[in-house]
A protein has these predicted regions:
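Alpha/beta-hydrolase-fold catalytic nucleophile elbow
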Residues: 189, 259, 284-285, 331, ...
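Sec/Tat signal peptide C-region and signal peptidase I cleavage site
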Residues: 18-22
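Primarily recognizes the serine-hydrolase "nucleophile elbow" in alpha/beta-hydrolase
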Residues: 181, 240-312, 590-678, 683-684
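Alpha/beta-hydrolase-fold serine-hydrolase catalytic core, especially in secreted/extracellular enzymes
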Residues: 23-137, 324-326, 331-503, 507-516, ...
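Positively charged n-region of N-terminal signal peptides that target proteins for export
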Residues: 1-4, 601
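Cap/lid segment of the alpha/beta-hydrolase catalytic domain
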Residues: 149-247, 288-299, 305, 510-597, ...
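Bacterial N-terminal signal peptides
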Residues: 7-16
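Alpha-helix capping and helix-loop boundary segments enriched in small/acidic/polar residues
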Residues: 162-170, 208-210, 225-233, 258-269, ...
């Protein structure tokens, strides 16, 4: 019986023989089977079903952690069985909200001024400037009905994310119809919009930072570094606007309302939760369940992000429930590009439980319409009807055709901007003053070097959200290897802190050495950036180093492709963590992996960080003494310099070729919220002592070479720490260098 064997060849194999099948049914002896030229693919997750969407690993990791807090909160809500239970929860939520956002500034003189009046049929528009804080000016227009008898209700209209603010035609329709129905309306410019642009550039007649949301995130990031939320200033401007309304003899203090659309809906929810004077609240296209928002559309901007909010058990729906049973109308559209309708429905259902328990279920309503992100005619009618109902105003709620005013007519300042008219302070200025107190405390702590270093070790782990490896990393997984001249490149993955893998390219010299010094190589553009033949990594390998080029979570293969760029950083903020802290944990895990290799000297493992990757690396090195030496190339010199200067850049956020409209994409993946309450990057450098550290080409807050003066100022403490540890010679600071290899060699000396 004959047996037939079939040779199955992959597509990359070619038979270099002529007419095999026509000349013979068997392979000739001299047949040459060879591989066709193959281009290297250095993606570790190539053809890997489980990790086939690595761009979602970071956000999913953060969502999973947030869900733990959401589940705890859901359990608390399920146990509320009486009006008394809900009242106790409301008090608890109020305390937490004040802890998260406050303390608010002291109330000072509003110093209101009227800069002009527009008279129209049936009403007038007064142009108002007031000071919510000394020298912090807010512009607005007050719509006042004619022929007022007694006192009338008043509504604060806070505005969503459009650049012209209340001058936008949609908001004019709202203001016009409310005032025609006998209600005073005060529409104000939020920070970063209208005439309250925070970074106005007269040369381009626009913000030098970008559109309103970009400004909000820009100064919001500075606030986060100082351990606060910029939401405080949006809320405070609104509360002080209500203070102004109550100075008007026409206003009924018992009939105060607030409404807003989109970002204005956000601030509406905030003000109504914090200010008990608000009787009626109408947040439009905002109120939703935090859980659903996070898993669908993701984080929106800095003012919607409460520092450690979710970790403290506070969610968006709490903002509705804390004011029960006061009248509240939610409006939403089904095809919203930014917000989740399912979440809004669930928020309504949960809040309805509270209103039911208070015996006033009718005080909470929700109206939906099928539309994109907008206030449709149906929704506008619902707004007018709801206010008229709860303010006891008779008449027809139907919408009238509004007479539009031009932006020029509604201009409050003669120059069109507060900054070019009165100057005054912006959010940056106020936050800088608050931060100066933190810096002063930090300098005092640094005087006791040993105690300060011990404190930094503890507080930096807590604030950054660093999680130490638990020793359960498991075995590495190999997904391919290439042989190059003199060394090999292996594609490996090791377990991260959660349900994700850390991709590594392992470069190993093909020599006869029993043990090698090893390096973790971190580049913000990913592990493949210098991985090609002739790149920096090859040079290091040919000097005898084992190199683990790594994509920590959120970088390279795992860079976020699943959501908006700001989502990762802000999702970490709400759970009390940071992308930097998570990445630092990844680095320590890679070091542990290197220590397990038989051809690596576990006492000679160093690390190289390029640009932004210096941030997680210096955290990791401060926390893990097994990182023997560190080379930082182009590191930002401090977080302090970012907060204490009006303008800053970070490499992960620069938008190439964006023009002035969006010159920045302001994510927060580089930041650690609350960092300046306890430490800064120079303190972490001090924690590395007495191990070797190289600081090459330090960058200032604009990513320009740091000046000698700035370097002296920021590195004063780490120099003191190295001297204290009798290792002054182990800290090297250079502005330029001939080769990376020379710096690495020095660090291993």
């Amino acid at each position: 019986m004959k047996k037939y064997f079939y040779l199955i060849l992959p597509v990359c194999l070619f038979l270099e023989v002529e007419n095999i099948y026509t000349q013979s049914k068997s392979l000739p002896i001299n047949v040459n089977i060879s591989l066709a030229p193959e281009e290297e693919n250095l993606n570790v997750f190539q053809q890997w079903i489980r990790w086939n969407n690595p761009g979602s690993l970071l956000i999913n990791h953060l969502i999973k952690q947030a869900f733990v807090y959401y589940d705890i909160r859901d359990g608390e809500i399920a146990r509320l069985k009486s009006e008394s239970d809900w009242r106790k929860r409301q008090e608890n939520v109020k305390d937490k909200l004040m802890e998260l956002i406050g303390p608010f500034p002291k109330k000072t003189a509003l110093n209101p001024r009227i800069t002009g009046v527009i008279k129209k049929e049936g009403f007038r528009v007064e142009k108002i400037i007031y000071e919510s804080m000394p020298g912090f000016y807010v512009t607005g227009c007050l719509y006042v009905p004619d022929r007022i008898k007694g006192k009338v209700p008043a509504i604060l209209n806070v505005i969503g994310h459009n650049q012209e603010a209340f001058r936008n035609q949609l908001y004019q329709v709202i203001n016009y119809n409310l005032v025609k129905k006998g209600i005073i309306v005060f529409a104000i410019d939020p920070p970063g919009q209208g005439e309250h642009v925070q970074y106005y550039d007269p040369d381009i007649k626009f913000s030098s930072i970008g559109y309103s949301v970009i400004e909000h995130c820009y100064f919001g990031n500075q606030c986060f570094l100082s351990g606060s939320s910029c939401a405080k200033y949006f809320i405070w401007d609104g509360m002080r606007a209500i203070d102004y309304l109550l100075t008007r003899k026409e206003v009924d203090a018992e009939r105060i309302g607030v409404t807003g659309f989109s970002g204005g809906g956000t601030v509406t929810s905030y003000i109504a939760a914090f200010d008990d004077r608000v009787k009626v609240s109408v947040p439009c296209s905002w109120a939703t369940v935090s859980r659903r928002q996070l898993e669908t559309k993701g984080g929106q901007d800095a003012e919607t992000t409460f520092y450690r909010g979710v970790a403290k058990g506070i969610t968006f729906e709490d903002l509705l429930e804390v004011r029960a049973p006061k009248p509240t109308l939610m409006t939403f559209v089904s095809r919203d590009e930014y917000l989740c309708l399912q979440g809004a429905r669930e928020a309504y259902t949960e809040a309805k439980m509270a209103y039911d328990m208070f015996g006033q279920a009718d005080n909470l309503e929700m109206v939906e319409d099928d539309s994109k992100h907008w206030m449709t005619p149906k929704i506008r009618l619902a707004i007018f009807s709801f206010f008229m109902k709860h303010f006891n105003i008779s008449g027809d709620p139907a919408e009238e055709e509004a007479e539009m005013l031009s932006e020029e007519e509604l201009k409050v300042t003669p120059t069109g901007q507060i900054s070019t008219f009165l100057g005054g302070e912006m959010i940056f200025d106020v936050n800088r003053k608050e931060t100066a107190k933190l810096i002063e405390n930090l300098e005092k702590s640094r005087k006791d070097i040993e105690q300060h270093l011990n404190t930094v070790q503890i507080k930096a782990k807590e604030i950054s959200g660093f999680v130490s490896p638990d020793g359960s990393a498991g075995k590495p997984f190999i997904n391919g290897r290439y042989q190059r001249e003199g060394y090999s490149v292996g594609k490996y993955a090791i377990r991260g802190e959660g349900d994700y893998a850390i991709p590594i390219l392992l470069f190993v010299p093909n020599d006869n050495k029993e043990k090698h010094s090893a390096l973790v190589y971190l580049h913000p553009m990913g592990k493949v950036t210098e991985a090609k033949p002739g790149g920096e990594i090859e040079k290091l390998v040919k000097e005898g180093y084992v190199v683990a080029a790594t994509d920590v979570l959120g970088i390279g293969e795992t860079k976020n492709t699943a959501a908006r760029g700001i989502t990762d950083g802000y999702s970490a903020v709400i759970i009390g963590r940071s992308v930097v802290g998570i990445q630092a944990g990844d680095i320590v895990r890679v070091v542990d992996y290197l220590k397990s290799l038989s051809d690596v000297d576990s006492l000679k493992i160093g690390a190289i960080g390029i640009n932004e990757m210096c941030l997680p690396l210096i955290h990791a090195a401060a926390f893990d003494p097994s990182i023997n030496n560190v080379v930082l190339i182009g590191s930002p010199i401090s977080y302090r310099s970012i907060v204490m200067n009006r303008f800053y850049k970070n490499g992960l956020s620069i938008h190439e070729g964006g023009g002035f409209w969006h010159p920045y994409e302001v994510d927060f993946s580089w930041g650690v919220a609350g960092v300046l309450t306890a430490y800064d990057l120079p303190d972490l450098i001090g924690c590395v002592a007495p191990r070797s550290v190289v600081l090459a080409g330090l960058k200032d807050q604009m990513l320009e070479p740091a000046s000698a003066e700035l370097i002296d100022q920021e590195l004063k403490f780490p120099h003191s720490a190295y001297s204290f540890k009798k290792a002054a010679e182990n800290m090297k600071v250079v502005s330029s260098f001939e080769s990376l290899g020379s710096l690495v060699d020095w660090s291993f000396k």
